[in-house]
Amino acid sequence: MTKYKEAHDNYLDLHIWKRKELENYILEPQVLFRLSQQSNDKYEHFLKELEELVDTYEDRVFDQYAEHILKYRKIDVSTANAETRKYMKDMWTNLENKLALVGGKEFLRCLNNWFKQKFSLNLSISQIISEFQKDEFDNEIVEVIRDMIL
């Protein structure tokens, strides 16, 4: 039985987020760049450094994905690893995907440390959210909230 059918049978609305954790939805490079208070000509360099930072999490993402496959499917370790390698090859291709896959809570802690060291700034979740402009929120978040209200 799928999770959606089980939820429907129990009169529940189910939404499975596309990103790993809710915190991943505030990992928007443009917003983070504005919070760094750098001049616009430094944006490309900021993106490069941000991607280098998130790339340090690639092995953790691989391990978590393989562990998830092993937990919920009855396959052997080598098959789970092969599937994970393919998934990572397909998905770990750009900064947007990487920021969706990394553990958001853990990466936010790392990001805050990076901001302290590099920019002498503390970075909080509320600061990040406050920096968002209306059109920068992911459509998925907007649609889920709209569905909950209506």
Question: Model-found features: residue ranges?
Answer:
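Acidic, divalent-metal-binding catalytic cores of TOPRIM
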Residues: 1-150
